Amino acid sequence: MYKNLKEVLTEAERINYTVGAFNAHNLEMVPDMIRAAKDAGSPIIIQTSVSTARYVGMKNFVAVCKTMANDLLVDVVLHLDHAKSFDDIKEAIDMGYSSVMFDGSSLPLRENIEKALRVVEYAHARNVSVECEIGTIGGTEEGVTVAEGVYTDPKQAIEFLKAVDVDALAVGVGTHHGQFQSKTELNFPLIEELHSLITKPLVIHGGTGVNEADYARLTENGIRKFNVGTELLVAWTRAAKHQFEETELNNSLRNNIMPCNEAVYDVVYHKTGLFLNKEHLTVGAK
């Protein structure tokens, strides 16, 4: 079914697992992402940046996600990631996205609260979920670089949540956007403190750089949404580079693109198995 974020994270909280949120960098990769989640036995969050949503067309993402959710009988959330503008968020909601993120993390706390309240009011009236962020994630995403991340201040997080009824909260705990050649040192004492103080589902951004050995500990400490973007981009691009370098110029474009999407399938299937603690899952079980 096509669901909102709150619905799938409530179930994840009840059973104690984490849901993978995978960034779609084009429309081509989305069907294989959803098939991978179906085969792994998990819901999936397909998320897009604002710029990717505009490149592909929001209605196109909505149509594919709704169709495949119904055809494959798998729970799919379509989420707008790191939106800073109310107009962008409103457009996504009006086009049919089931979840949005308002990122006011760079704003003073009071301004973040005021703008988040407006988003929540509009979204919840339309059964759309809202994620917000306290603290910042370092690294580069969509051409925007944040030199250093800022750890989430637990007191600010509590103050924010007292004022704003968000459905999930992204926290700064040491991860970085765009990191794939090294691994992140997570601040587990902070994660544990946040989990002890906050009842809302917590979200990890910049998940590609997180050591897979840490996944289970993150789940036990309330991480219910785990974002993966760069790893999918690298897998798809690496496969594309190989295909276009090794095949003739008149090779079917379909035959060149399919291995790229299969590489994305493998990443989503593998990660989803780890998020579910299903160690028997293996890459490529299609």
Named regions from a protein language model:
Residues 3-15, 26-51, 59-75, 82-200, ...:
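Alpha/beta enzyme core
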Residues 18, 104, 252-256:
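Short amphipathic alpha-helical segments at helix-loop
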Residues 55:
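Cofactor-binding active-site loop characterized by glycine-rich and histidine/acidic residues
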Residues 204-206:
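Thr-Gly-centered strand-to-loop micro-motif
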Residues 241-286:
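Extended, intrinsically disordered, low-complexity segments
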